[in-house]
């Protein structure tokens, strides 16, 4: 699919398979989510721009590469998105964090927004929006709508699983936002869950129903 990158690294796929298993414990699911988020972060940041900086090693001065521009923003769609943040922040501890409170009404499958907090100068930053699941796409669309209202121009979306229906819906509204995912699954069921999927990521991460 155009505009979609499937991250098929063997370690990503191995960990994702264990996360899919219904017998995987809450603690195990949470640990795997942290580990896989670090691997996914490598891929979604692969083409960040570098600039040269004059530094001094214990032996001599050199020109060495360093990230250019303002700090990245990781924008978590609450609550499940927070599960991806920990591993990503271990890799990029200087990143700024945005929280976007959007939940899916289980009757209408439409997003309901209840919270938004973001750093300043979004128009000068790369914003990586994170949510484990791209199902209908409605929540991620609403979150990115809000970020664009606040000036964000350079946005990427990172998830574990995506449904074809969600990808089409998402890119129908935000064709300029590339999607990075570990898997494109088969379809959505009548309740809007990704099949075969891994269940409700938030519930499995926090041990709730």
From Swiss-Prot:
GO molecular function: GTP binding; magnesium ion binding; uracil phosphoribosyltransferase activity
A GO biological process held by the record: UMP salvage
Annotated binding of 5-phospho-alpha-D-ribose 1-diphosphate, by residue: 79, 104, 131-139, 200
Keyword Zinc in record: no
Cofactors that this protein relies on: Mg(2+)
EC numbers on record: 2.4.2.9
CDD domains from the UniProt entry: PRTases_typeI
Activity regulation (UniProt): Allosterically activated by GTP.
Positions contributing to uracil binding: 194, 199-201
Catalyzed reactions per annotation: UMP + diphosphate = 5-phospho-alpha-D-ribose 1-diphosphate + uracil
Coiled coil: none
UniProt keyword list: Allosteric enzyme, Glycosyltransferase, GTP-binding, Magnesium, Nucleotide-binding, Transferase
NCBIfam families found in the cross-reference section: PRK00129.1, upp
PANTHER family tied to this protein: ADENINE PHOSPHORIBOSYLTRANSFERASE, URACIL PHOSPHORIBOSYLTRANSFERASE, CHLOROPLASTIC
Name of the protein this chain belongs to: Uracil phosphoribosyltransferase
């Amino acid at each position: 699919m155009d505009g979609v990158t499937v991250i098929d690294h063997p370690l990503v796929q191995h960990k994702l398979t264990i996360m899919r298993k219904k017998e995987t414990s809450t603690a195990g699911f949470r640990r795997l989510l942290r580990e896989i988020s670090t691997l996914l972060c490598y891929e979604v940041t692969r083409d960040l721009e570098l600039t040269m900086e004059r530094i001094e090693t214990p032996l001599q001065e050199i020109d060495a590469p360093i990230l250019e521009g303002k700090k990245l923003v990781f924008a978590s769609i609450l609550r499940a998105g927070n599960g991806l943040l920990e591993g990503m922040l271990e890799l990029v501890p200087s990143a700024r964090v945005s929280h976007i409170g959007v939940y899916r009404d289980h009757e209408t499958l439409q997003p309901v927004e209840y919270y938004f907090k973001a750093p300043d100068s979004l128009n000068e930053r790369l914003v990586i929006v994170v949510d484990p699941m791209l199902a209908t796409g409605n929540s991620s669309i609403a979150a990115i709508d809000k970020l664009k209202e606040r000036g964000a121009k350079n946005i990427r979306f990172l998830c574990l699983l995506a449904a074809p229906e969600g990808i089409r819906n998402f890119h129908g509204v935000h064709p300029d936002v590339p999607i990075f995912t570990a898997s494109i699954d088969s379809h959505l069921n009548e309740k809007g869950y990704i099949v075969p999927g891994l269940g409700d990521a938030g519930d499995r991460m926090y041990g709730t129903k």
